[in-house]
Amino acid sequence: MKESMSKTRVAINGFGRIGRTILRILLLSDTDIEIVAINDLGDYQTLAYLLKYDTVFGVLKEDVRIENKKLIVGNNGYNIKLISERDPSLIPWKELDIDIVIEATGAFANRESLEQHINAGAGKVILTVPPKDEIDATIVLGVNEEVLDGSMQLISNASCTTNCLAPI
């Protein structure tokens, strides 16, 4: 991770429903997180369209366009590199100086596949689905977030079902 004064550099692997929702939340938040890159195999124009026109969240107010393999959102400099790489071990996380990869494809959910992001240069991986085998931690906010520490590299935020039931 970077010094406390710099932003945390994050990449999203998988720009489906979860990946797009994460980006929308971060766009609307005042946070020290910088979305640096998105890796998805879809057509870039289609990805931009799906971000702009969401059936659940509605139309994103900011302008969304593709320029030179970058997703440009708004006029304030959201300039996100787009990558289309099927193999996580070949994604240039080290070159991009990525602190955290948000793994949102659903395809990589075991320790071995998640470690490919670490081997490619990412500092940590947050899995958006339940893991298929043992990783460093599965965290449910409001239940066990106190076990999370900075040494953990592979964590999961459980599942949408688990998180919706946690407050009960």
List each model region and its residues.
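N-terminal Rossmann-like NAD(P) cofactor-binding subdomain of oxidoreductases
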Residues: 2-168
